[in-house]
A protein has these predicted regions:
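Edge beta-strand at a domain terminus
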Residues: 1-8, 17, 52-54, 84-86, ...
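N-terminal glycine/threonine-rich, aromatic-flanked beta-hairpin/loop signature
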Residues: 2-4, 11-14, 22-59
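Generic short beta-strand segments
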Residues: 13-19, 63-67
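Beta-strand elements of well-folded, non-transmembrane domains
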Residues: 16, 37, 68, 81-83, ...
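Short, surface-exposed coil-to-beta transition loops
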Residues: 27-30, 47-50, 72-76, 96-100
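Mid-chain, well-packed structural core segment of small domains
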Residues: 53-85
Length: 128
């Protein structure tokens, strides 16, 4: 488990993104990012992902691995604490889109964020 600075530790509600806007942000549940250093997750739009953190001097960076709907994806990102207590973040999809986001402190979700589905979850039951 990585030691996350206390000012970052917890759950964050992703309130807006520069590329995808706010429409559909919560389509599969409240858009959230967990920063605990153990079993962290990201959920927004149709993205479910596992997150691995790295502590930097004035920010946190992360790698993520998951799926957008049933398409496996991965990427990188970073967050920096603002003076108003919110996070400024960046999210990049490997070989794809990049977006900034703003996140606000939040309570943990009532139900845990599900594991990202794989293409097998979509196509595994089909017989060709």
């Amino acid at each position: 488990m990585i030691e996350i600075p206390s000012e970052y530790r917890g759950w964050w509600r992703i309130a807006e993104t520069s590329l995808w806007g706010e429409s559909g942000l919560d389509v599969i549940g409240t858009a959230l990012l967990s920063i605990t250093g153990s079993d962290d997750r990201l959920r927004m739009h149709c993205l479910l992902a596992y997150v691995n953190w790295k502590v930097n001097t004035a920010s946190l960076s992360f790698n993520w691995n998951g799926s957008w709907e049933f398409d496996e994806m991965s990427g990188t990102g970073n967050v920096k604490l603002r003076r108003d207590g919110r996070l400024d973040g960046r999210l990049a999809i490997k070989n794809g889109d990049k977006s900034t986001f703003v996140a606000e402190p939040a309570e943990p979700p009532e139900h845990s964020i599900p594991h990202p589905p794989s293409w097998r979850d979509k196509w595994g039951s089909r017989r060709w």
